[in-house]
Amino acid sequence: MTSPDFQHHYVNLKGVRLHYVTLGQGRPMILIHGWPQTWYEWRRLMPLLADKFSLVAPDLRGLGDSSRPSKGYDKKTVAGDLWNLMHDHLGFERFIVVGHDWGAPTAFRLAADHPDAVTHLAMLDAPVPGDLPQGAGLGGAQRWHHLFHQVPDLPEALVYGRERLYLEWFFMAGTDQAGVFSDADIAEYVRTYSQPGAMRAGFNFYRALPQDVADNRELFATGFKLPMPTLGLGGGGSRGRADLIVQSLRRVALRASGGAIADCGHFIPEEKPEELARQLREFLA
């Protein structure tokens, strides 16, 4: 389901065509989705914030209804797309950044590269790459896919024609309560990830992790810390990573807060949109 008030747009940026959705009026905020999702993961949250915020929810390069470049899936490049969207195209001089899953490391990089423009940063259920010891945060058997998706070519070959089976497993395994995703919700995600090149693009977000780690560690070596207020939230369920995220932000930011959302798994914006909206409003007050 989508609200009739959602406005869909396309913009040609440097080397990529982005699809993005807008809703609301007020302080500008970009919502950055993760894998295996699209802008659609924010559909329940956006109406809850639209009275106070101008919300922008893009499909990241390679995903959703955006174009699928063959390269550029490191989070510094992906964050550059979003800077071009928010600052150069939409004209926002200062804005709030919220990211979930792979959107969280992208959000971190956007804030790190433009600390004077990003007023607040919220990261949902994903830590900062390069801050943790090698292998930390992968979650062992729970997050086996982090390594599998980095294998060249094989994931694409095995998943081809089985996109729904593969993606639906993550949606079911990653939630703390039954019934979060309807058949229509899953069909919308499968629609975009079944398009040519979409699964490869999604896996490329994982394959870029070594570059993300190197880029961030180069930044940390300078002593840099995020100056804006930061919020780290994780699901309190078995697949949530609340403590890991908050500890990570405390090491890389001057002002960090956060914690766990109870009875929630990985997919916070869809499992607990009302609680997420409440915590974001409190953080941004």
Report each predicted region and the residues it spans.
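Surface-exposed alpha-helical interface segments used for non-catalytic interactions
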Residues: 40-43, 47, 80, 108, ...
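Catalytic histidine-centered segment of alpha/beta-hydrolase-like enzymes
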Residues: 264-273, 277
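Flexible "cap/lid" subdomain of the alpha/beta-hydrolase fold that forms the substrate-access gate
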Residues: 1-9, 16-18, 28, 56, ...
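Conserved HGGG/HGGXW glycine-rich cap/lid loop of the alpha/beta-hydrolase fold
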Residues: 21-65
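Short strand-coil-strand connectors
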Residues: 12-14, 33
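A short, glycine- and basic residue-enriched loop/turn
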Residues: 38-39, 105, 264-265
